[in-house]
Regions:
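Chitinase-like catalytic core of GlcNAc-active glycosidases
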Residues: 1-261, 271-272, 287-296, 300-301
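Conserved short secondary-structure transition element at the edge of the structured enzyme core
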Residues: 264-267
Length: 307
């Protein structure tokens, strides 16, 4: 059970994080927030130390969670760095293109200083040739080189035992046939797991189940199976199914505990030993009322993976 913790939101309580196996700190960014358009750092300087929760660096919580056996991962990116959807004008990712070595060095320093277990790349921006980039000289090729190089070099640079690497792509971006899919597949050996967002895209598993359509235009299971079989050679433990609790009403993709539990139970019928679930966001997991039942359905603790 992997939980995204919005680091501007309240710090979680023990009854919230009891079920979590991983906590992803969202987000490390290279901007300062502004309501109309975020103020990008032109040199892609990443804010440090990265806040943990309540806009504060709570090293005590990171150390506590790790002492309990949880993995604490810092996520670089998020929607505020730039989104590929209509109406979004943030473009901070573009200032990072060509600065791969600096990005890797900065994230390595952050991981070491704050005792994180690794890095998540949360990239929801453009990567195709001909996409609507903002800055002169920005291209799909530069975006793809950035994603590939940062992924590869982080795995090689982060210290042993603190070098978990993952991505959390939007579901259409991780669809077989896209350039992003190809980058992820080429880096399969560098990815400890992948967290596709089944709430930002074509599928509506909370309403349609894994194999149906209706609310969504595509079914989730074929997408998931491509990741399992084509990208990760049949290892379903590498693919973590993504949910949004209540921030995604605009796309009709919220999943309550009953709906998400049903999806995970259904997924267990196809892949008895899978990568479990992740969700956005801790602030909406009131008292663990979402993560508790969904974790039970997902078999958190590995009960479904026993030989």
């Amino acid at each position: 059970m992997i939980a995204y913790l919005g680091n501007w939101q309240a710090c979680p309580t023990p009854d919230q994080y009891a079920e979590y196996t991983h906590i992803v700190i969202a987000f490390a960014v290279s901007y300062t927030w502004s309501p109309s358009k975020n103020n990008c750092d032109s040199q892609c300087n990443i804010g440090s130390p990265v806040p943990i929760c309540n806009n504060q660096n709570r090293q005590d919580l990171v150390d506590l969670w790790r002492s309990q056996g949880k993995k604490v991962i810092v996520s670089f990116g998020g929607a505020g760095m730039g989104g590929s959807w209509a109406g979004d004008n943030n473009d901070c990712w573009e200032y990072c293109f060509g600065k791969e070595a600096s990005v890797v060095s900065q994230l390595d320093a952050i991981v070491r200083a704050q005792n994180f277990d690794g890095v998540d790349i949360d990239y929801e921006y453009f990567y195709n040739d001909g996409d609507a980039f903002s800055l002169p000289g920005s291209t799909g090729a530069k975006a793809r080189y950035f994603l590939d190089t940062v992924t590869r070099d982080l795995k090689a640079t982060l210290p042993a035992g603190q070098n978990l690497i993952t991505h959390a792509p939007m579901e259409p971006d991780s669809e077989k046939g896209t350039e992003y899919y190809d980058i992820l597949k080429a880096n399969a050996a560098n990815l400890d797991f992948l967290m596709p967002q089944y709430y930002n895209g074509w599928t509506r598993p909370a309403l349609d189940g894994l194999t149906g359509t209706g609310a969504g235009s595509k079914a989730a299971l074929p997408h998931y199976n491509d990741l399992v079989y084509d990208m990760f050679g049949g290892d379903a433990t590498k693919v973590v199914f993504g949910f949004c609790i209540s921030d995604c009403s605009g796309t009709g993709t919220n999943a309550n505990a009953v709906q998400a539990s049903a999806v995970m139970t259904e997924l267990g019928g196809y892949h008895s030993c899978n990568g479990g679930a992740f969700f956005w966001v801790v602030n909406h997991d009131y008292g663990g009322a979402w993560s508790g039942p969904v974790g039970d359905a997902a078999g958190v603790g590995g009960s479904n993976c026993d030989a």
